[in-house]
Design a protein with these regions (language model features):
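Transmembrane beta-barrel domains of Gram-negative outer membranes and organellar outer membranes
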Residues: 26-263
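Cleavable N-terminal export/targeting peptides
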Residues: 1-36
């Protein structure tokens, strides 16, 4: 399958970059680079541009392949705005029609409301606009999704715990499409490792209020590395653990690769 081949090529390129980095010079600059500063203080917003490619394996032989460019502008360390617009390919499997095109545009505003030693609280709102080229590539609705998460330092483990809650609700759009009303809960964990490597564990519980509060669970583990002063890359596999064939946002398994430039 072409999408799988392209993703395998991306993974191979990233693996080569990961392995090549330890061969660089041993001298380290006194000041943290932009990428290192972001890893050290993840709640200090910095402007960044990134692109990621996610392959989701669905029931049967169906799949989604999603390429998402994202730009985030830090107005100041406590305020940021974000835009992202995915390009998607969806194949339902079973001989169904494959479709490709633009997905829904997402815009976010985020504010770090509290910053104390070892603790921060961020509040944000996403607005997802109905811009998809095809009904199968988007929600068919305009969605508002308020969002809040904390950042709790765990210095004994060189980690940060990010308890995270977000609620998605449709406010406008195609009346023939189903309403959107679900909540996600994510007890995320960032851990820093030697050689500028990090991991980010993201279990996501999704509660769909339109389906009698049916709950799904996906678990993803991102393994990333700082490649230069401004560039980081990552690989993120994931699995669907609960209700993977009964909720639209719970896949069978997925694999994501990405690269980020931090200004």
């Amino acid at each position: 399958m072409q999408a799988k081949s392209e993703l395998a090529l991306c993974c191979t390129c990233l693996l080569i970059l990961f392995l090549a980095q330890p061969l660089a010079g041993q001298a380290q600059p006194a000041a943290l680079s932009a990428a290192e500063a972001t890893l050290k203080k993840p709640t200090d917003f910095r402007s960044r541009a990134e692109v990621r490619n996610e392959y989701q394996n669905l029931e049967g032989d169906g799949y989604r392949d999603i390429v998402t460019p994202r730009f985030e502008y830090a107005v100041k360390p406590s305020v940021a705005v974000r835009l992202e617009l995915p390009y998607m390919t969806y194949d339902p499997g079973g001989g169904g029609e494959r479709v490709s095109g633009q997905g829904d545009l997402l815009a976010r505003g985020a504010w770090r409301a509290i910053q104390r030693e070892g603790f921060a609280l961020i509040v944000a709102t996403d607005v997802i606009f109905d811009t998809a080229d095809d009904d199968r590539l988007g929600f068919g609705k305009t969605i508002v999704a308020p969002h809040m998460y904390a950042a709790i330092d765990l210095p004994g483990y060189d980690s940060v715990f990010f308890p995270n809650i977000q609620h998605y609700v449709s406010v406008a759009g195609d009346r023939t499409r189903g309403d959107v009303n679900f909540t996600t809960l994510k007890p995320n964990l960032l851990t820093r490792w030697p050689n500028k490597i990090y991991t980010f564990l993201e279990p996501q519980f999704s509660i769909d209020w339109e389906r009698d509060a049916k709950t799904g669970l996906t678990i993803e583990l991102e393994v990333g590395k700082i490649l230069s002063r401004n560039i980081a890359a990552w690989v993120r596999p994931g699995i669907g653990a609960i209700n993977k064939y009964e909720l639209p946002f719970v896949y069978e398994w997925n694999l994501e690769v990405g690269m980020r430039y931090i200004f």
